[in-house]
Amino acid sequence: MTGMEPIAHIHTDLPQKFGIPRNSFLAPHLQGRIVFEPEFASNAAVEGLDSFSHLWLMWRFENGTPGGTAKDIAADAKSRDRSGTNAKWSKTVRPPRLGGAERVGVFATRSPFRPNPIGLTCVKLDHVELTDDGPIIHVLGADLRDGTPIYDIKPYIPFADCHPDATGGWIEDAPWQELDVEFPQALQDMVPPAKISGLVEVLRQDPRRAGSKHEPNRVYHLAYAGLDISFTVDETQLTVVAVNDAQD
């Protein structure tokens, strides 16, 4: 963005586009750490921030991915299929919530393929860690890829930002179908306990591309927290079948 530079980058457990929630708070236990660039790494700059419960993050899309480049966009962690990527904006888009079939205007969506690649996310503030190298802001519920550049941070102010009479447009007529997740205990034991809740929430949202074919025998791979999570999907049932260390 012309005349602007990142003040920080967020570090999350999702290194690829595949698996990133389509909106914040769909996976409310997803952990994120915002680490400032040296020029902005001042403990004084975040004084008073910990009195707020939620924050707004302004960030940048890169080639349609929160913090990624075209080579990072993958259908799953194994294939690195980059089909469907596009560095240009589109006047109309196919929202996943509509099954990837119907088109609506880009400005009536939060599609990444916009004239200006700006993203806006609301997150829950977990805590602010003050270090000798500057503050680290720990947040929950971010829908951002690991390494996404952050351009600004603002407090969420309830009386100004919360509108009880707000309506959701076409989204209200397109409820999202969550998946039932079967995660054998033996495989759960291979995931750090603090990462389990966020992982299950990501899987429940169905990481697959909208309109994916019914392929109950296909094994998908999700890169998460340094792990390769293998799973299958049959109708509305997602089953985790393996957990391994992620391959570089």
Predicted segments with their positions:
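Glycine-rich, low-complexity intrinsically disordered segments
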Residues: 1-122, 126-248
